[in-house]
Amino acid sequence: MIYTAIDTFYLTDEQLRDSPSRKDGIDEATETALRVYGCDLIQESGILLKLPQAVMATAQVLFHRFYCKKSFVRFSVKRVAASCVWLAGKLEESPRRSKHIIIVFHRMECRRENVPIEHLDVFSKKYSDLKHDLVRTERHLLKEMGFICHVEHPHKFISNYLATLEAPELTQEAWNLANDSLRTTLCVRFKSEVVACGVVYAAARRHGVPLPEDPPWWNVFDADEAGIQEVCRVLAHLYSLPKSQYIQVYKDNDSFTHRRTSDTNASKESPATTVASDKGTPVPSSSSQEKDALIKAGSDKVKEKGDDDGKTLPSEPNGKEGPAVNLKSEKSESNVDRSRERERDRSRGRDRDSRGRDSDRDSKGRDSDRERERDREADRDRQRRHHSKDRSSGYSDKEKSRHRSSRDRGDHYSSHSSRDKDRHRRQ
C-alpha cells in the first residue's frame, strides 16, 4: 500500500518492481518506454501551450505518481498526460482551457502518426467525448493523490548549491539534467535535494570541474554518495534509450484522432441487427446475406406477434378465423382513431396556448400604450399650467403699469387745477 502525504510520496525499489503495470503483465522496458513517452508528450504540449517550465515539471511528477498506483493497461497514457498538464496548470497558477489542451494533443498525435491534420470541431461528438474523458481522468488523478498535489522540484536547490560551490558555469548543464531527470522515476524515489546533488555532480563530471572531497561536499546538502551515484546511473540509462515510441497496451482506443471502437460499432449497428442478434440468428458479413437475414428476422418477429395476438383471442371450435381477423382490424382502426383524436387534442391545446400568449402580448401592449398616453397627457397639463402662469404674471405687470400711469396722470391734472385756482384767487 502506498500512502500519500506532503513530501512523503517516495517508493522503494521493491514497490517499483511490484507496480500495478507489472501485475498486468507489462515488463520493465515497456513501462519505462511508456513513462518516457508520456513525459515527452507533456513537455511538447507545454511548449506549444506556452506554459512555464514549472508547469511541465509538476505535470511530469504527477504523471509518475499516478502510474505508481495505476496500470498502463487500464488508463491511457495519452489521456493521463493531457489531464496532468491541465491539472498542473491550475496548481502552478497558469491555467489553460480544456479546449486548447485537447486541440494541442490532437495536433501532436497527427504529427507523430504522420496523418493529415484535420480540424477538430468543438461541437462534435468526438470533442465532447474527449472533454468528458479529460475531466474524468483529472478526477482519477485527484482521487489517487488524495487531493495532495504538493510538488517540490530540484531546480530551486541547484542555484544555491552551485553558488556555495563557486561553480556558476555548471548552472545551465545542471538545469538541463534536472529537466531530463523528470522523465524517469527519480522524482518518486529520492528527495529533491538528492536529485539536485546528483545532477550537479553529473554536470561537474561532464565539464571536468573539480568538487571538494575532503570533507565530501554532499554532506553539506543532506545527501549521500549512494543516492548521487544512483541518480547518475539512471540518467546515463535514459540517454542510452532510443527515441520514445507509443506502445499499445491500453485495452480501449485512446486516440485523439479517431473515435472509440465501441462508438463506431454502436453507430454502425441498426435496430434490425440488434433484433437478429437477440433472437440468436447470426448476421453474415456480405451485404446480400445481411439483407436476407434482416428480412427473415423481421418476418419472424411479425409472425411471433401474430401468434401472441391469436393466443390472447378466443378461438372457435370449428376453426373459423373470420371473427378474429375482424376483431384485429377493428382494434387497429380504433387505435388509429384514438391516435388521431390525441393529435387533434394536442393541436387544439397548442392553438389555445398560442392564442393565450398572443392575448397576453396584446394586453401588455395595450397597457403600455395606455401608460404612454397618460404620460403624454400629464406632460401636456404641465405645459398648460406653465403657460397659464406666465400669462397671468404678464397681465399683472401690465395692470400695475396702467395703475401707475393713471396715478401719475391724476397727480399731473390735480397739480394743474390747483395752479389755476391760485391764479383766480390772486386776481
UniProtKB/Swiss-Prot annotation:
Please verify whether the record's keywords include Ligase.
no
Pfam families documented for this protein: Cyclin_N
Q: Where is this region: Disordered?
A: 258-427
Comp. bias intervals (Basic and acidic residues): 289-311, 328-382, 390-400, 407-421
SMART domains, per the entry = CYCLIN (SM00385)
Keywords in alphabetical order, please: Cell cycle, Cell division, Cyclin
Q: Name one GO biological process term.
A: response to salt stress
GO MF annotations, alphabetized: cyclin-dependent protein serine/threonine kinase regulator activity
CDD domains, per database record: CYCLIN_AcCycL_rpt2 (cd20594)
Cellular compartments per GO CC: nucleus
Q: InterPro entries annotated for this entry?
A: Cyclin-like_dom, Cyclin-like_sf, Cyclin/Ssn8, Cyclin_N
Tagged with keyword Cell division: yes
**Highest taxon of the lineage:** Eukaryota
Q: Which SUPFAM superfamilies does the UniProt entry name for this protein?
A: Cyclin-like (SSF47954)
Which residue spans adopt a coiled-coil conformation according to this UniProt entry?
none
In this chain, composition skew of type Polar residues spans 263-276
What Gene3D superfamilies does the database record attribute to this sequence? Cyclin-like
Its family? Belongs to the cyclin family. Cyclin L subfamily.
Name the record gives this protein = Cyclin-L1-1
